[in-house]
Amino acid sequence: MNIEIIPAMDLIDGACVRLAQGDYDRRTTYGGDPLDTALRFEAAGLLRLHMVDLEVLERIAARTRLEIQYGGGIKSRTALCDVFSAGARRAVCGSVAVREPDCLAAWLAEFGGERLILGADLRDGRIAIAGWSEETPLGAAELIGRFRKQGLQQVICTDIARDGMLCGPATSFYAALQAEFPNVEITVSGGIATLGDLTALDRAGLRSVIVGKALYEGRITLEDLGRCLPNE
């Protein structure tokens, strides 16, 4: 399998949680130290970690070799630099791409497309921003197209309706989006439930996928992922 598998780590009060469709009232909390969880990811051979907590990010960056991509509330260059200083290798920018596209374009020029990821979160085919509370008329392709010539290299595209629902990803949609932008890595997020989902995405030509709830609930195990590492 060639697709890169990126575990997700969302935290509330220092504990790993998974939300259903981003709803904090429908969250499941998983015990254990997040650092121990990250160390298990690393031991399994995973290379990247997707997370949204700066304090825990610093601990994990200092104690593992995982490449951390951080997303959540990056609205200024100062905030972006804080994320990098905390140890993140990549930063995910969503709302700022819609509200201040010139700002993201400038960051892409300064930091490079290998460090800046566009966050494209979709509800009913339209981009949602501000923690998914505000919908826009933009589609994913339109938003990606705005930054294709600005050095954009990676997009995390989250299907909000499927996030945390274990219902399977919208594979055909992602495959079409990847085909439209062959020079941009489209990272799938939302709905992953089984190894079969990962296999289908891999066969469809997707390059990376974020796995959250299925991993924490044991539907996909670290042993499974260890056998699915790229080119193994």
Regions found by a protein language model. Give the residues of each.
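Conserved anion-binding
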Residues: 12-25, 81, 88-163
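Short, acidic/polar
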Residues: 30-41, 75-81, 135-146, 198
